[in-house]
């Protein structure tokens, strides 16, 4: 509806698995084109999009400036860009022993290239000619780690990643156990 019958929505992701999921979710729409590409080389025409969005993606791209240049290239003059990213330095679990919790979180820092991208982004966009740059904080607090909770997923991702960064399995299991006990 947002782009009308003549408009096109482009979905860009380097992961075929993600695009397969998107294809299933969007199967009822005829004007969505999914592209298996990286954000730094969409192969879209210049000035072809009225808006572009990125949701928790740019912080994982080592050279985010190249991707921002690509976004700038494909946007029509006056086009809008919306980014949703987490301030990873402020993303924390609470309840576990402070030292152990910090060890897990410190290990997790290596999971993305730009821990604090929302703080860097306004200057980067301004240098590319963007106007009316605005920030909108989206705070969220999750108090339960049930099976459908983002916290449940994040805990598993952080635990597995910590193992790849030299944190012992015993420490990871202890951390997870402490989180579970803190919730009770």
Across the structure, where does each feature detected by a protein language model lie?
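Class I SAM-dependent methyltransferase SAM/SAH-binding core
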Residues: 1-42, 66
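Short, hinge-like loop/turn segments at secondary-structure boundaries
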Residues: 27-29, 99-101, 151-153
